[in-house]
């Protein structure tokens, strides 16, 4: 059973479907959240009544990176058709060149000049709506940060104010998420992702887990996930339940021994120190089942201007909180720990 705000829920596929997949825990939002005007992919609606949310699919948005733009330009040298992807590699389609414009899908088209511009920009992703080409980037007046999708060799990375939220040096976001999950395999039972981001770990965990709950505090990050084709299982997979809210406020409401695995990939210590606090670690220990595992990403020692070895500090704090078998994995820059007891 899962307890949230005093309500007892049987957390299984049927209840997940009733819940609609997305929960809102931000008290400032009472009826609906509308994304920034001018190119919104849709509206996530929810009500104060628990379980009153409606799962909505995003509107179809064509996304291109330098990879697809370069492919099309090369193929158009030999004819007026090109096979390419309009969703960052998920699927392929045939597009045609007519009178200096590439007809993509429906009313969407892009000029050759814009296609050449996209091909030269290797660190950005572009959305095409009818004849408009826009870089996928958002500025938040609340956090005063910019949010951007950045192309990689497989799944896009999230960049916040020029700081990458994914590892891409010597790896890719997908391979990195797969490597992390191998540290806590077998991935079974109930999984919690405390800081969802683009949701790659939650998506991969859902392949074998019974259920996955993912928490995301930043509505701008959630917007990036809704735009990202490779994040769509978050909104479509009935095994995955999303909560829009603050993990430090939500997790205390969970019952004891609720989860088999907890993935904790918080922002930097300077941004979210509360997610590294002793009290928060104690709550993570409490909600894990005996033998359950914690996967805590810390990053490389000294990275992003750090003067401390964060992984060593986290290792000490987790041991002090009562975790067992606490150790650091140098390949993924994660600390792995377990709640004492036997895993069922």
Where are these regions (language model features)?
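A short glycine-rich, Lys/Arg-flanked "PGG" loop and its adjoining helix->strand segment in the class I
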Residues: 276-290
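Class I S-adenosyl-L-methionine
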Residues: 302-344
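S-adenosyl-L-methionine
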Residues: 218-255
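Conserved SAM-binding motif I beta-strand of class I
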Residues: 211-216
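Conserved beta-strand signature within the Rossmann-like core of class I S-adenosyl-L-methionine
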Residues: 291-298
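Conserved class I S-adenosyl-L-methionine
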Residues: 187-197
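N-terminal auxiliary segments of SAM/dcSAM-dependent transferases
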Residues: 44-150
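Conserved SAM-binding loop of SAM-dependent methyltransferases across substrates and taxa
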Residues: 198-209
């Amino acid at each position: 059973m899962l307890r949230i705000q005093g309500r007892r829920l049987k957390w299984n596929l049927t209840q997940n479907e009733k819940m609609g997949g997305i929960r809102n825990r931000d008290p400032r939002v009472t009826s609906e959240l509308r994304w920034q005007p001018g190119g919104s992919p849709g509206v996530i609606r929810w009500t104060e009544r628990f379980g009153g949310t409606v799962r909505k699919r995003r509107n179809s948005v064509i996304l291109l990176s330098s990879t697809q733009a370069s492919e099309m330009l090369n193929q158009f040298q030999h004819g007026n058709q090109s096979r390419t992807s309009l969703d960052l590699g998920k699927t392929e389609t045939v597009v045609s060149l007519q009178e200096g414009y590439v007809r993509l899908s429906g009313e969407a088209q892009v000029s050759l000049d814009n296609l050449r511009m996209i091909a030269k920009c290797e660190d950005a992703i572009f959305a095409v709506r009818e004849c408009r080409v826009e870089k996928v980037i958002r500025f938040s007046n609340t956090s005063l940060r910019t949010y951007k999708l950045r192309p990689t060799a497989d799944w896009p990375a999230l960049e916040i104010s020029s700081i990458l939220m994914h590892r891409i040096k010597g790896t890719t976001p997908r391979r990195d998420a797969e490597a992390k999950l191998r540290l806590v395999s077998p991935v079974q039972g109930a999984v919690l992702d405390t800081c969802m981001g683009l949701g790659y770990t939650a998506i991969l965990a859902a392949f074998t887990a019974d259920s996955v709950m993912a928490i995301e505090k930043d509505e701008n990050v959630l917007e990036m996930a809704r735009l990202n084709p490779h994040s769509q299982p978050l909104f479509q997979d009935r095994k995955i339940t999303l909560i829009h809210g603050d993990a430090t406020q939500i997790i205390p409401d969970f019952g004891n021994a609720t989860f088999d695995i907890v993935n904790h990939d918080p922002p930097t210590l300077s941004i979210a120190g509360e997610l590294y606090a002793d009290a928060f670690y104690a709550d993570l220990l409490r909600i894990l089942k005996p033998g359950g595992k914690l996967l805590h990403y810390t990053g490389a020692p000294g990275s992003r201007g750090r003067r401390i070895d964060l992984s060593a500090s986290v290792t000490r704090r987790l041991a002090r909180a009562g975790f067992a078998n606490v150790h650091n994995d140098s390949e993924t820059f994660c600390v792995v720990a377990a709640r004492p007891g036997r895993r069922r």
